[in-house]
């Protein structure tokens, strides 16, 4: 699925232990979901080599990030634990999606962040990942 540059970041919010990145994609929810559930879509989001399995299944990306699938609801939500590397504390990445107008609203929330984690870098990471996921 190729998404023109109309995909926009609507907000990037931060709290003490979480960040949130919101994008509106001018594609139907069903197309966005199909893209996310294909190998290149999930790799675009989580990193090369990452594959989502059933709830409780681990995933690993070649950049060292890893986690476990926590929740998977078709055309609604994907929630994974996320570790930046083997020594990093567990955090949670929750991607919610819903129809908005003729497109899809994506809301990615990265929770349970420690004070040492660079929130600006994480916002940039997830913003870029969401764009990659919706560009192919």
Give the positions of each predicted feature:
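A conserved amphipathic terminal alpha-helix motif
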Residues: 1-8, 111-136
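Hydrophobic ligand-binding cavity/cleft-lining segments
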Residues: 1-51
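Tryptophan-centric aromatic hotspots in well-structured domains and transmembrane helices
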Residues: 33-36, 82, 123-126
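Generic hydrophobic alpha-helical segments
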Residues: 39, 76, 132-133
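Hydrophobic-ligand binding "helix-grip"
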Residues: 43, 50-51, 57-117
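Juxtamembrane/interface motifs at transmembrane-helix termini
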Residues: 52-55, 126-128
């Amino acid at each position: 699925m190729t998404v023109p540059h109309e995909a926009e970041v609507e907000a990037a919010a931060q709290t003490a232990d979480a960040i949130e990145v919101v994008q509106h994609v001018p594609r139907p929810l069903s197309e966005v979901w199909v893209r996310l559930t294909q190998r290149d879509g999930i790799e675009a989001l989580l990193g090369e080599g990452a594959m989502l399995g059933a709830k409780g299944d681990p995933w690993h990306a070649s950049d060292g990030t890893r986690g476990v699938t926590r929740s998977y609801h078709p055309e609604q939500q994907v929630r994974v634990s996320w570790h930046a590397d083997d020594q990093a504390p567990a955090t949670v990445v929750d991607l919610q999606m819903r129809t908005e107008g003729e497109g899809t609203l994506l809301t990615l929330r990265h929770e349970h962040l420690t004070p040492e984690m660079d929130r600006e870098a994480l916002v940039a990471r997830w913003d870029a990942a969401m764009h990659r996921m919706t560009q192919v």
